[in-house]
Amino acid sequence: MITIEKALKHMAWSNQEIFNEISKMPQGIYSLRAAEGEWPVGKIMNHFVNAAEWFQFLLTGKELSDLPRITNHEILLQMKLKIGEVDQVLIAEFSKPDEEITFTGDDGNQHKTTRAMVLTQAIMHTAEHKGQLSTILKASGHQLDLDKYDLWSYESQNQ
């Protein structure tokens, strides 16, 4: 059976690969969006990092950073390093016992979850937004082939 640890390692690898690939596209891609009112590419890329920091906060208590908006390749590559660091923290969290975590949500209420749930959500969350990102880029004439970053590709490159 695949473990959450392997899924986290795949997530971290694919995050790095996708940040690299985006950095090779034209600078203007950061303002592309699926439709009026939807998030542009730059905001989605920021959301990968912000969300990773949120999951890290839930598990470790480390406060969130004041991250710059991703509007160009230079900032994207800085944030690639940041998400790489946070992804390593999430991978390390897998080795700890699953336990209940209590946190205050955006609604001001106390919520309960578990370490396994937070780690699983981190994995699923990135997958969801990678699909969104790929669709925006394809609709705008750019190609982000997510099959290049699937679990089989990860396995073949990390044996």
Predicted segments — roles?
Residues 5-20, 24-69, 107-159:
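Short, contiguous alpha-helical
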Residues 61-97:
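Helix-adjacent hinge/juxtasegments
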Residues 94-108:
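Acidic catalytic patch
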